[in-house]
UniProtKB/Swiss-Prot annotation:
The keyword Repressor does not apply. This is Large ribosomal subunit protein bL32. Gene3D superfamilies: Single helix bin. NCBIfam families: rpmF_bact. It comes from Brucella canis (strain ATCC 23365 / NCTC 10854 / RM-666).
Length: 59
């Protein structure tokens, strides 16, 4: 079984845990419809992605 050779300092432990925090997802305003959507995702209401029609729009 692996055992640590040295004690982990509180500073190093905190730096390791700093990446574990959850953050709220980011949203951008769609240029055409003004709706909020995730960046690099399809706008589900219009079906547009990067200026192209990808899906049929929801009614």
């Amino acid at each position: 079984m692996a055992v640590p050779k040295r004690k982990t300092s509180p500073s190093r432990r905190g730096m390791r845990r700093s990446a574990d925090a959850l953050k709220a997802p980011t949203y951008v305003e769609d240029k055409n419809s003004g709706e909020l959507r995730r960046p690099h995702h399809i706008d589900l209401k219009s079906g547009m992605y990067r200026g192209r029609q990808v899906l049929e729009p929801k009614e």
